[in-house]
Swiss-Prot record:
GO terms for cellular component: cytoplasm. Keywords: ATP-binding, Cytoplasm, Glutamine amidotransferase, Hydrolase, Ligase, Nucleotide-binding, Purine biosynthesis. The gene is purQ. This is Phosphoribosylformylglycinamidine synthase subunit PurQ. It comes from the Bacteria.
Amino acid sequence: MKFAVIVFPGSNCDVDMFHAIKDELGEEVDYVWHDTENLDEYDAILLPGGFSYGDYLRCGAISRFANAMKAVQKAAEQGKPILGVCNGFQILVESGLLPGALMRNENLKFMCRTVQLRVENNETMFTSQYEKDEVINIPIAHGEGNYYCDEETLKKLEENNQIAFRYVENPNGSVSDIAGIVNEKGNVLGMMPHPERAVDELLGGAEGLKVFQSILKQWRETYVVNA
C-alpha cells in the first residue's frame, strides 16, 4: 500500500505522519508537495497538522485552494481513504469534504496535552481495529479545535453514524464532544487529536496506531484478497 503525506507551507506534523507509516506501519509513503496535480499512484492520502500558510484568514482557508486539494477531492470521489489530522481536519472542512467548522478553543488558549477519546463508531475504514466504546489516549495540540455545526447537521451526523471519536472530557468546547467525523461515504476522516503521535510505546503509547492499521486492513481486504 502506498500513502501520500501532503505538505503545505507551514505543515509541521508531516514528519510524524511519515514516521507512523514507514517505520511503524511498514508501508510505502511519500512526501507530496501541495502543488501536485495528480495523486493517482497513491492508495491513501494524509493531510498532516501544522499551520498551513500561517493560518491566515482562517485555519485551512488558503490551503483549500492548493492544486493538491483538487487531486484530494478526486481521490475522495474514487473512495480512497483520506485522513486529515488537526490542521488537516480544518482543511477538509474548508474544502467541503466534511461538514461543520473549527473555531477557537472555548478558553481561547492553545492546548497541548494527551486526552481520552471514546471510539463511537468502529465500523469505518479508520476505526475497525478498535472496539466500540473503547477509550484511547491520544495527544492534542491546537488553538482552533472547537468543532461546530448546526443542529440539523449534528442530527444528520448522529443518524448516519458519522461521529468516529468523542472526547471523554471535552477540552475545547466542541459541540457534542466531537473529536472526529467521517463523511457520508465513510472514506474521509477528520480528527483534531494526533494519532500519528501515539504510535510508539517507547514514546508514551501506541493507541493511535490502530487508525493506520485499520486503513491498511481495509485496503488489503479490498485489493489484495480480491486480486
